[in-house]
Structure formats: structure tokens, C-alpha cells
């Protein structure tokens, strides 16, 4: 076989005797040709069948049957005498005279008007308002702040207004001032800061 290496003969294999095989002598058997037997044919005598003469059929004479036309009986018409019905003369209806009913005009009752005497209300003389003298805000805010008990900002005094100035006036902290400023625009950052303060409390 290709690709298979031959084994190197070892000492054991070399010691063995190599047996030489003799080819067996083939016997040539003489083939006998098969002998075919010819079958003897039997001659069968055929009988001739006598043909029967069939008598010719005579055509049957057709009877001409006279067809009778169906006779229609004419029904005798009965003459019915019509009676003339006397017409009834309907009396002409007289038009019914309509009664002219005099329509009564609804009489309206005139309600007597009550004359209500109006009382003349005496006009109250309103005293002329005197112009209120404007209070001149003094430069010293300390006296007003101490009297009012409210800090100088436009809101109620809270704990945030704890810082007291040297003059004795309570001044709001920056947080309290910014909350009330109308011009202040709120941003997302300020909202977040305020929420954080509320949560911390």
C-alpha cells in the first residue's frame, strides 16, 4: 500500500522458514452440451361446422292509425239580463247659515294710580376733608424702627432679622431681603438651594 512503511525484518522473522505455497492444479471439467428434445407435433383434425341458414325476417306491416283530432266543446254562453238600478236623486245640501257671533272686546280696567308723595331727603353737608399733613421721615430711622417693632424692610419682623446695627436698628439678613425683592428672578439653582434648606430643617 502507498504511504505505509515496510517493517524492518527483525531477527525472529528472519529465523522463520518461508513456506512456498504451490498453486493447486485446476481440473478442466469437460462441459456437456445440453441436448434439446424435439417434441413430436400432433396433427389435430379440424371439424368443419355446418352453417345454419337463418330465415329472412319479413318486415311487419305498420298499421296506419288515424289520429282523431280532439273536439273542443264550446260552452254555451249564458246571457245574463242586467237590471237597471234606479239612481237615487240626492237632495242638494243647503249651505248652513253661519251665525255672526259678535266678539266682545276685552275691557281693560284702568288701575287707579296711587300718588306716592316723595320725601325730599335733606342733603348732608359733608365737611371738606383737610389735607393730611405728610409725615416727614426723619433721617434717624432708629427711633421709628424701635417704636414700630418692625425692621426697615417691607415684611414682618422674623428671626432672620436678628442682626442689630450699631445704631440699635434691627437690619434684615440678606436672605430675608432677597425673598421679598419683586425684581428678583428665580432660577433653577435658587429653587434647589431653597429646597435643600427646607429638607435640612
Swiss-Prot record:
Pfam families on file: HC2
UniProt keyword terms in alphabetical order: DNA-binding
Family the entry assigns: Belongs to the histone H1/H5 family. HCT subfamily.
Biological-process GO terms, alphabetical: chromosome condensation
Region named Disordered: 1-69
General function of this protein: Might have a role in establishing the nucleoid structure of elementary bodies.
Keyword DNA-binding: yes
Keyword Membrane: no
Gene: hctB
Protein name (record): Histone-like protein HC2
Highest taxon above the source species: Bacteria
Biased composition (Basic residues): 8-50, 59-69
A GO MF label: structural constituent of chromatin
